Amino acid sequence: MKINLDRTSSGFCIGVQGTIHVAEEKLNNPDKLFSLGDVVHNEAEVNRLEHLGLTTIDESGFHELKNAQLLIRAHGEPPSTYRIAEKNNLVITDTTCPVVSRLQRTARLLHELGYQIIIYGKPSHPEVIGINGHCKNSAVIIKHPDLSDPSETGQIDLKRKTALISQTTMDVPGFYELKANIRNLFAADSEEIRNENDHLWMAIRDIDLTASLTGIRDMPRYVYKDTICRQVSSRNQMLHDFAIANSCVIFVAGKKSSNGQVLFGICKAANPCTYFIEDIDEIDDAWLTGSDGRTVESVGICGATSTPMWLLEKVAAHLQRRYNHDPA
């Protein structure tokens, strides 16, 4: 059986790499380091870092923490976190992903300009909670691009000027599907919008925000900014092709990983013989056996942006020992 390990489109994204690198450096120091929430949505990697000395705390633990070192993970945090940290005399090491930081700034400026903010994302995701905090927790969060959830659409004020942005790890097609459906929702409520073309929903850049804030020119009533991380979204096609190229696919990710669920779905759609695991003890021998009782010709091992490469290598080594009788 040929074992193919995907080193191109799997493993930590740049934002997570930065967080892990900084955490490892800090853990070489004698001062205890605390992480607000799991440093990454992968239990095996969290366990590795905790073995090195990292302590993971939840919100209640954070409020009680005083005079300590605090790590802000790549997902970012709302402004309230920084205020509490200052009050509790916490020394912050901020590893918010630069892509997320720019998105937080965009959300804050759009809110200051009076826009109703719609975020394409998952309401409970840490990144979305952070973004929403930068617009004073006033954003409408939409998870379903087809607008099928009335509890989401019911929050949209059709009379307000509106800006659409996205969680950085959501899917690009879903974002543009949501944009089209929101435009139709507003158009159904307004004859003025029905009589206009798509330019009413203008794609904006940072320069447009600056121009509007400084009074050089105003932005349209309805705007959108595609804030999806292209380093993440570019993996979609590569993983699709990787899945097709193998008889069977073992997809490795943490069950909490939002990106993992999306990428697993892409692999599964490309190759129905795709299976999700967190670690090697979840591998079922039946997955790797063909209808003739022989092992499959090839197995591909891949994972999410929150999956460490060492874990993918561990899975590959396990399969090599078990199926190719390699003692290495």
Swiss-Prot record:
One term of GO molecular function: 4-hydroxy-3-methylbut-2-enyl diphosphate reductase activity
Catalytic activity annotation: isopentenyl diphosphate + 2 oxidized [2Fe-2S]-[ferredoxin] + H2O = (2E)-4-hydroxy-3-methylbut-2-enyl diphosphate + 2 reduced [2Fe-2S]-[ferredoxin] + 2 H(+); dimethylallyl diphosphate + 2 oxidized [2Fe-2S]-[ferredoxin] + H2O = (2E)-4-hydroxy-3-methylbut-2-enyl diphosphate + 2 reduced [2Fe-2S]-[ferredoxin] + 2 H(+)
Cofactor, how bound (note): Binds 1 [4Fe-4S] cluster per subunit.
Classification via InterPro entries: LytB/IspH
GO biological process: dimethylallyl diphosphate biosynthetic process; isopentenyl diphosphate biosynthetic process, methylerythritol 4-phosphate pathway; terpenoid biosynthetic process
Cofactor(s) the protein requires to work: [4Fe-4S] cluster
HAMAP family referenced in this protein's UniProt entry, alphabetically: IspH (MF_00191)
Protein name as it appears in the record: 4-hydroxy-3-methylbut-2-enyl diphosphate reductase
Species per Swiss-Prot/TrEMBL record: Chlorobium phaeobacteroides (strain DSM 266 / SMG 266 / 2430)
Annotated gene: ispH
